[in-house]
Amino acid sequence: MNAAIRDKNIVLIGFMGVGKTTIGQLVSKKLGRDFIDIDHEIEKDFQMTIPEMFQQKGEAFFRQTEKEYIFQMCEHTMGNIVSLGGGAFQQEEIRKKCLEHCFVIFLDLRWENWKQRMDLLIENRPVLHNRTIEEMKQLFNERKSIYAFHHLKVETDNRSAEETADYIVEMLKLGQS
């Protein structure tokens, strides 16, 4: 693996439900690296779910907390596989920090394929609550333009989580971006 990549955290970005956590766990096992899910770390430390945090403390509090955790990860850890929440890259400061200090992989999925997963996602994704299908599609497209800032894009539409993880490991070993 390219030395420049080997010493960096590998950050997975993409829309909610694309498989960042599942794929990240698989990649971490294949590479023998630790896995960090930023949302899970926040939930563990605050002893509440992200939906509960949105409800009790508000989205602004969550986004600030998320930024602090991501900055901490970027500045003080190396060599991990890290899953960011789907909205994290909306914050320009987070984008810049991750792109500067980490190797960022965008897990892409077509709207039609994401829509098939939607019913499984809505309950645990507060930003989807009370949105129409048109509003969800708009959010999907807005975030997709933000995810354009990355080092490697991986299409997940025609791959299982295992196949996607294998592809990522192969690309990292080749040092391709």
Curated annotation (Swiss-Prot):
Binds 1 Mg(2+) ion per subunit. GO terms for molecular function: ATP binding; magnesium ion binding; shikimate kinase activity. Its EC number is 2.7.1.71. One of its GO terms (cellular component) is cytosol. It is found in: Cytoplasm. Keywords: Amino-acid biosynthesis, Aromatic amino acid biosynthesis, ATP-binding, Cytoplasm, Kinase, Magnesium, Metal-binding, Nucleotide-binding, Transferase. ATP binds at residues 17-22, 125, 159. The keyword ATP-binding applies. Substrate binds at residues 39, 63, 86, 143. Disulfide bonds: none annotated. This is Shikimate kinase. It comes from Bacillus licheniformis (strain ATCC 14580 / DSM 13 / JCM 2505 / CCUG 7422 / NBRC 12200 / NCIMB 9375 / NCTC 10341 / NRRL NRS-1264 / Gibson 46).
